[in-house]
Amino acid sequence: MALLISLPGGTPAMAQILLLLSSACLHAGNSERSNRKNGFGVNQPESCSGVQGGSIDIPFSFYFPWKLAKDPQMSIAWRWKDFHGEFIYNSSLPFIHEHFKGRLILNWTQGQTSGVLRILNLKESDQTRYFGRVFLQTTEGIQFWQSIPGTQLNVTNATCTPTTLPSTTAATSAHTQNDITEVKSANIGGLDLQTTVGLATAAAVFLVGVLGLIVFLWWKRRRQGQKTKAEIPAREPLETSEKHESVGHEGQCMDPKENPKDNNIVYASISLSSPTSPGTAPNLPVHGNPQEETVYSIVKAK
């Protein structure tokens, strides 16, 4: 294919430059069509950005025209800095570059054609270009290829803040401080109210419990007192009756004085004893003697 360019009054040097540019464009287009026709490649974003100390995900996907073997043994590798740079990760070994120890995670499963490379705890030195590379076993043998442009990673400083006017910043800070103070005051007031209500409730419950205990003890003591008073009168008649029966028994057992008849005078002795009727209360001696005797005499005339 030839391209004819004619420039009126132009120089041969200018014509040669235009021819070179045209041939380069045609070559690039043919190369792209050839890759699409062959059907293999790695897709990655052109660039991505992250914050220092944070994390970043670099997504990737790949495609190919070959038929996979029974055991394709797929593996993913990554390079950095340039197309032929050092390997920083290899899933088949596995291998992680010393610079990325504990900071690389490959979210990819065997057999899948897409995944994500995650870089943790970003550093300023991580800012460079990254290239994904694919290995797999096909019916035609081992095939491998990688991304040509790669992905440019940009790392920004976490301390970077947008510039603002001092007056605006001061006013905003003062307003924010006032809002925070008001919120804290509101929270403290609400907390005091809740505490007061809780203490009042606890005090009321405590007083009710104490009053209930006092009433219970008073009722129990009163009940015991009534029971004691009821038992004492029941015991006193029984003890008095037993005492009187003892006294009466002694009176009945006492033999009257037998005075012999002397000069036609008959002496008789009467002693007090318990009554014949058990229902009648006995009469206690008036004096301190346990038993009183009365002597009567009768004179008989002949």
Curated annotation (Swiss-Prot):
Glycans are attached at N90, N107. InterPro entries: Ig-like_dom_sf (IPR036179), Ig-like_fold (IPR013783), Immunoregulatory_rcpt-like (IPR051694). It is a single-pass type I membrane protein. Residues 1-31 form the signal peptide. GO terms for biological process: signal transduction. One of its GO terms (cellular component) is membrane. Residues 228-248 have a biased composition (Basic and acidic residues). Its main location: membrane. It comes from the Eukaryota. A motif (ITIM motif 1) lies at residues 265-270. Residues 220-302 are cytoplasmic. Phosphorylated on tyrosine residues. Keywords: Glycoprotein, Membrane, Phosphoprotein, Receptor, Signal, Transmembrane, Transmembrane helix. Residues 270-280 have a biased composition (Polar residues). Residues 228-293 are annotated as: Disordered. Interacts with CD99. Contains 2 copies of a cytoplasmic motif that is referred to as the immunoreceptor tyrosine-based inhibitor motif (ITIM). This motif is involved in modulation of cellular responses. The phosphorylated ITIM motif can bind the SH2 domain of several SH2-containing phosphatases. PTPN6 seems to bind predominantly to the first ITIM motif. Paired receptors consist of highly related activating and inhibitory receptors and are widely involved in the regulation of the immune system. Receptor for CD99 and PIANP. This is Paired immunoglobulin-like type 2 receptor alpha. It comes from Mus musculus. The gene is Pilra.
